[in-house]
Design a protein with these regions (language model features):
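Conserved mixed alpha/beta catalytic, RNA-binding, or beta-rich assembly cores of soluble enzyme
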Residues: 87, 150-163, 173-205, 215, ...
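Short histidine-centered loop motifs in beta-beta connectors
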Residues: 68-77, 81
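Conserved hydrophobic positions within beta-strands
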Residues: 101-103
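Hydrophobic alpha-helical positions that pack around
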Residues: 185, 219, 223-332, 338-344, ...
Length: 470
């Protein structure tokens, strides 16, 4: 909290008035971009629960961590909340049936990223039979039992990476966690589901945050962007109601992209940098998403596994933008036109995710997964279709890179297959936020080229490791 002092002169009375104003400090980082927000399309629309009209879902077998193996087969009857795929690996998360019904088939299906992966298709029976866990008091159980509950609930991060939460909350013994950062920034354009969640069910968010704080013994910090300042009093009231104002602090961060990135939040709030090749936990911080906090609360209070996803459906070609909750595995095309109305003629781009980090999809026949925060139907006015031209050497990509990397130099090194040089330039540290491509006047798809380069680096490293073992 900053305190500003002013003297105001009133000429009619020839007097001075002393004024003291309290102003909340705004935290930020160097670089980043300011794209058009486009949040007004869905910001004021309440969240509604929706069931797929066909009553059929297609659930990816793996949605975070090591590959799962199906525990059911075609023809099996399942109930809502039943585990249908799991792994014995530590870094993994089970997958549960989101409706009750019958397993129709197990096979490859299109998912986000235009990949085809193993999925379990369930035909719902409309009975809504459930197999939830017994509720568990998070403040009267051991950390071991709490972590087991989170793992059994299949909770993964809902901010994009879908990393298993029980692993994230259980760092090496020599690592002290000082802060759980609740990421309420929601910095990417169009997406408003976190905003609506914080506005409509703040008690679930704060409860989930407190549970994660209890497990780790950390303090809590809520990072709220300054374009969502109307949520401040709502969150303050909830914190006071839970009598935890000594343990949870709200900090206002500047509204820009990619403010919601793990690394950028830690840099903004605590001026700490994640080491090259390291993990955020090495800074003493764990960043968790608003939706993840809600899932944690539900797992303990209701015994409910992560079988639903709250998301925004929006874009200029979406005639009825919505914030909805759907069963995990709901096929996007199944929501059209009964749930959302889309102008197919105006749609030139379909995205799973936001406009900067989302995947461009070839079809709407893909399932909403645990990590799907947004589906966008964009018009030609919303999409940059200008052709790529050679780099003009302006350096704008370097100016906006939040990590201080040189994207154009990295891409140049990758172009001539100089993997070693690209590595020294920090290619593996890139968070693929897309700021460089957004600002590039030459329309060079920098982040796509870097993403491919990172894959090549990983393959080369794996090859060297295999060669060394041989």
């Amino acid at each position: 909290m900053n305190i500003l002092f002013f003297f105001i002169y009133f000429p009619f009375t020839n007097s001075l008035c002393f004024v003291k104003i309290k102003v909340m400090k705004t935290y930020t980082f160097k670089g980043g971009v300011k794209p058009q927000e486009c949040k007004e399309l869905s910001k004021d629309i309440n969240i509604c629960e929706v069931l797929p009209p066909s009553k059929t879902v297609t659930i990816p077998v793996t949605m975070g961590g090591a590959n799962n193996v199906p525990t059911v087969k075609a023809g099996d009857k399942v109930v809502k909340g039943q585990i249908i795929a799991d792994s014995t690996e530590f870094i993994s998360a089970p997958v549960h049936a989101s409706p009750s019904g019958t397993v129709k088939e197990i096979g490859l299906h299109l998912v986000s990223g235009n990949l085809k992966v193993s999925c379990i298709t369930i035909e719902g029976d409309g009975l809504d039979s459930t197999s939830y866990m017994e509720p568990l008091d998070p403040f009267n159980c051991s950390s071991k039992d709490a972590l087991k509950r989170i793992r059994d609930a299949g909770i993964t991060g809902q901010g994009g990476a879908s990393f298993p939460l029980h692993v994230k909350l259980n760092p090496p013994a020599n690592t002290e966690i000082k802060y759980i950062i609740l990421n309420a920034a929601e910095c990417e354009p169009y997406i408003t589901i976190d905003y609506r969640t914080l506005k409509e069910t703040p008690h679930r968010v704060i409860d989930g945050l407190r549970i994660m704080m209890k497990i780790t013994g950390a303090k809590g910090v809520i990072a709220l962007e300054d374009n969502k300042i109307d949520l401040l009093e709502i969150l303050k009231a909830e914190i006071l109601k839970e009598n935890c104002s000594q343990d949870i602090e709200i900090r206002i961060v500047k509204s820009k992209y990619p403010q919601g990135s793990e690394k950028m939040l830690i840099k903004s709030l605590f001026n700490k940098e994640v080491p090259s090749g390291g993990l955020p936990v090495e800074t003493g911080c764990i960043v968790s998403n608003t939706g993840t906090a809600c899932a944690v609360s539900d797992a303990f209070r209701l015994g409910k596994p992560l079988i639903e996803r709250a998301l925004t459906i929006s874009g200029g070609a979406c005639e009825t933008p919505k914030n909805i909750i759907v069963p995990v595995g709901t096929i996007v095309s199944d929501l059209v036109p009964e749930v959302v109305k889309i102008n197919a003629e105006k749609t030139v781009k379909l995205l799973s995710g936001g406009p900067l980090m989302g995947s461009s999809m070839i079809s709407a026949d893909f399932p909403i997964a645990k990590g799907t925060a947004c589906v966008l139907f964009l018009t030609k006015e919303e999409v940059n279709t200008d052709p790529e031209i050679p780099c003009i050497g302006c350096g704008k990509c370097i100016d906006v890179c939040p990590l201080g990397l040189a994207p154009t130099l990295i891409v140049s090194a990758l172009k001539v297959r100089n993997i070693e040089k690209a590595g020294k330039l920090g290619v593996m540290d890139c968070v693929e936020c897309g700021s460089c491509g957004f600002i590039c006047p030459a329309n060079v798809p920098l982040v796509q080229k870097i993403r491919l380069g990172k894959a090549n680096v990983k393959r080369q490293m794996a090859s060297k490791t295999a060669g060394g073992k041989a």
